[in-house]
Every structure is written in structure tokens, then in C-alpha cells.
């Protein structure tokens, strides 16, 4: 079983980061840690997208990873995309420290996030509560600032 992964985030602007994934066992939650720099202060949507394709920048990563065909939600909602990790918050200097534990993510099996793309978005994710169609798809999180493919590590 794969139990560690990493993702290096890069975009067309100043936003960069490194995100680590650790899963102690098959039925255990995935711990997501890391740091993203170059952000505007405040909340930014943070999602795993369906494809590991960054040939056309972050746009070719496709929609949020959603193998169960659910609507968009927050990380604590029972109805959500597997890739819905909510928001990360950048401080006044534009740095977001990531510390998330998520029971829906997995690093192995049919719905593994390995080979998919992690994306940091321009705006705050409304967690599917924005009252419009786009909210139920993307959380109205806006453009894709930086992304990277999630890969196996030691």
C-alpha cells in the first residue's frame, strides 16, 4: 500500500507550494500538510481535481475529483466531492500553512488521489452553500492559481 505522496504546486504567477500526504493504513484518514506562498491574504479553495494532466496549465486538470457523483460541499459534509478539502487561509504575508486530516481521501485503491492534480484557487470556497449552480460544482472558488500532480514519495 502507498502511504506517502507529495505535490509541488506551481502556476503562472507568484504562487508556489509543497503539499505532503500521509496515510498510516488502508482505512485511516490522510494527513495533508505543507505550505503555499505568494497568495493574497485570506481564504482560498483547495481541491483535488480529477486528472493528472497539466499540459494546458491547471485548466486541463478537469473538475474536482468526484468518483461518487455528488454535489460540491465542505470537508465535513457527508455530501461532497472526494476532492473537496475546503479552504486554506493565507496570513498577511501570503503564506498558508496546511494541516488537514481527511477520511474521504485515500492513497491507494480504486479512488486513489495519486496521479491526480491538487489545485489552489483564487477565491474562498463557499462549500456548496452559495445558492447557485456553480456553488454546487466548484464552490465559486474562482480561477486556478497553482497546481501540481500528486506523486508517490518515500
Curated annotation (Swiss-Prot):
The lineage of its organism: Eukaryota, Metazoa, Chordata, Craniata, Vertebrata. Zn(2+) binds at residues 64, 72, 81, 84. GO terms for biological process: neuron cellular homeostasis; removal of superoxide radicals; response to metal ion; response to methylmercury; response to xenobiotic stimulus. A lipid is attached at residue 7 (S-palmitoyl cysteine). It is found in: Cytoplasm; Nucleus. Cu cation binds at residues 47, 49, 64, 121. It comes from Danio rerio (Zebrafish). Pfam families: Sod_Cu (PF00080). GO terms for molecular function: copper ion binding; superoxide dismutase activity. Its cofactor is Cu cation; Zn(2+). Destroys radicals which are normally produced within the cells and which are toxic to biological systems. It catalyses: 2 superoxide + 2 H(+) = H2O2 + O2. This is Superoxide dismutase [Cu-Zn]. Belongs to the Cu-Zn superoxide dismutase family. The keyword Phosphoprotein does not apply. GO terms for cellular component: cytosol; mitochondrion; nucleus; peroxisome. Keywords: Antioxidant, Copper, Cytoplasm, Disulfide bond, Lipoprotein, Metal-binding, Nucleus, Oxidoreductase, Palmitate, Zinc. SUPFAM superfamilies: Cu,Zn superoxide dismutase-like. Disulfide bonds join 58-147.
